[in-house]
Amino acid sequence: MCTGICFTDNVGNLYFGRNLDWNAPFGERILIMPKGYPLAYSFLDDAPSAHAAIGMGIAYKGYPLFFDCGNDAGLAVAGLNFPGYDQYERAPVNGKANVAAYEFPEWIAANFACISEVQTALENVAIVGKPVSEQLGTSLLHWIISDAKRSIVVEYMADGMHVYDNPVDTLANQPTFSFHLENLRNYISADGAFPEPAKWRRAELAPSGSGATLRGIPGDFYSPSRFGKAAFLKAHYPAKDTESENVARMFH
């Protein structure tokens, strides 16, 4: 199960995070990719990293396989599980910049400084389902990418690449991002405000406790439920001033 969100503080600093819940460890650890680090791509020309990046993932024969990361320009990316919907290219596509799925996060972090640059580059990109090795296989993912101004979601399916503006700065797992956005309409009656007492004929009805502000917001671990809850909390959580308070906000 994966859920990711991002937000900025009162002075424009980006906070970007996700959970990564597996039933077994992969040996993941903190990875640091220095600026100028040589990257040997599967289909693109080898090139040094234009940006330094730090994130979580595994290293395979000196190659950083980021699950999520952020670079020195303030651009961040995370891959979240998306089985049953994603469909990468089986082979490189002529006339396209072909990026192997396992390379996608580090390719983003190594080469771009903002969402606008990423969107321009993605207009000519094909994502190829080539695994880094036969032992590791290919992860079935979609991605949230963010800078301090906005975020996007990238999904690669049978009909090609989809790049969505992400107005709620949230992502979970399958189904598609467009489904998750549409599903939020089920919760529009929850506005984060404490309800006033109601009168039904002679009965005076007051809310039962402070949790009434979340009435109707799902609390289970199903992907659409996690997306709905995370998007709601992200939108209604009070703004904070300090770094420690905003880190706590991310974990909450």
Locate predicted features.
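C-terminus-biased signal that marks the final domain/tail of proteins
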Residues: 1-15, 130-131, 138-139, 148, ...
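Short acidic-glycine loop/turn motifs at beta-strand connectors
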Residues: 8-11, 71-73, 146-150, 155-160, ...
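A short, surface-exposed interaction/processing loop segment used at functional sites
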Residues: 23-43, 161-191
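Peripheral peptide segments
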Residues: 69, 82-83, 90-92, 121, ...
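Proteins synthesized as precursors that undergo proteolytic processing into mature forms
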Residues: 95-131, 243-252
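Aromatic- and glycine-enriched pocket-lining scaffold segments that form the walls
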Residues: 115, 119-156
